[in-house]
Swiss-Prot record:
Location in or out of the cell: Secreted
Protein name: Alpha-2-antiplasmin
PROSITE patterns noted in UniProt: SERPIN
Key word RNA-binding present: no
Database matches in InterPro entries: Alpha2AP_serpin_dom, Serpin_CS, Serpin_dom, Serpin_fam, Serpin_sf, Serpin_sf_1, Serpin_sf_2
Annotated positions for site Reactive bond for chymotrypsin: M404, S405
Keywords recorded for this protein, A-Z: Acute phase, Disease variant, Disulfide bond, Glycoprotein, Isopeptide bond, Protease inhibitor, Secreted, Serine protease inhibitor, Signal, Sulfation
Disease / disorder: Alpha-2-plasmin inhibitor deficiency: An autosomal recessive disorder resulting in severe hemorrhagic diathesis.
Site (Reactive bond for plasmin): R403, M404
Tissue specificity statement from the Swiss-Prot or TrEMBL entry: Expressed by the liver and secreted in plasma.
Reported modifications of this chain: Proteolytically cleaved at Pro-39 by both the prolyl endopeptidase FAP form and antiplasmin-cleaving enzyme FAP soluble form to generate mature alpha-2-antiplasmin.
Record gene name: SERPINF2
Amino acid sequence: MALLWGLLVLSWSCLQGPCSVFSPVSAMEPLGRQLTSGPNQEQVSPLTLLKLGNQEPGGQTALKSPPGVCSRDPTPEQTHRLARAMMAFTADLFSLVAQTSTCPNLILSPLSVALALSHLALGAQNHTLQRLQQVLHAGSGPCLPHLLSRLCQDLGPGAFRLAARMYLQKGFPIKEDFLEQSEQLFGAKPVSLTGKQEDDLANINQWVKEATEGKIQEFLSGLPEDTVLLLLNAIHFQGFWRNKFDPSLTQRDSFHLDEQFTVPVEMMQARTYPLRWFLLEQPEIQVAHFPFKNNMSFVVLVPTHFEWNVSQVLANLSWDTLHPPLVWERPTKVRLPKLYLKHQMDLVATLSQLGLQELFQAPDLRGISEQSLVVSGVQHQSTLELSEVGVEAAAATSIAMSRMSLSSFSVNRPFLFFIFEDTTGLPLFVGSVRNPNPSAPRELKEQQDSPGNKDFLQSLKGFPRGDKLFGPDLKLVPPMEEDYPQFGSPK
């Protein structure tokens, strides 16, 4: 079973000092109460009180589309194109995060970040809008927020939950069109900040706790005094293995940090696990798809060399590389460590490096408000729990697969992983694990248990190898029955 939670918050501040905005009537209800229109509020709705008009200066305006164009269901071609764009954005984002992080293990939800940025794109104009579209690899089409919203609504019912909320400084004038689209596409019901930091923090953290089913207890520890708008979204994913691991087979084992050291881990095991896996043309990376129910997959990438970095691997990966045709499930002896990962980060520097520095300096967000706004913070937190629980496979499947020849796939060295929604191909989470048990003391390997990479790769000699660790294009070897080796993992 995999339990994942992703949370992201964008905060906006006034561009020049605190905002002094006079509003005769508060258009938002107090923090923590849902917007309603009672019998004494029939004359005008709360949203109408925020209407400042939809006329904007010349130039490219906020994301708009002809009536009905973006309300249609995504076509297979649009879904396919969006999945590839999201994969490219994921690689860009995670490569930069990994370059600057000193943490042994990382996890983030690129979908959560993309949703927040596409939410922002609803109110972005001119160069700000263009940069957002470029970073998200979305081209110039106006329907990105609508496509992401529609696809997220259809993701694995029961396993996937997306919650969003918008917090506003009391009385701050937000354009009605932005509020309406936020509610329609992201379910981000506007709630006003009280101005009392202690109360606001308590209420925000309570919402986060409820949205993540208690897995993120305290997300924010403080708010900038000049914060006028917060966008939060929380992703909750509970993935049950389609073929569960037998807890009685889980045992203490070694995870190889490098050529010299190991750490003890709880290793889940299965003797005949139905697994889709393959090697790339240069056999330094093993890739396996562990299926969840509800059309989700935990995709593991295990480089066979210890000397690798995330940027090297992701630079040569694409959606098509990780989703090859004609790769079928086969009975496999599997070892996979139980995991608990938690990582929180500020993405301001990372997004600036991607080309969005304008958001934090002088963005054009006049589709949100005529008041000058600047993004003051982008906080993200994700959590992953990986355990044995799943849904038992049908007995007929087990019997049929047990008649086939067995291979082995062992995740006992540093690896990357993705969680994909298989129907749409959207990457929900991405992460890397260098040390699944960082609190444990490192153990020195005995000499005979420390084979060199040359020895380790002898079992892969049936596959062509290139001269470089990671070549310019990682391609797949056509899978053939006789080409599946018995992996000789380090012990």
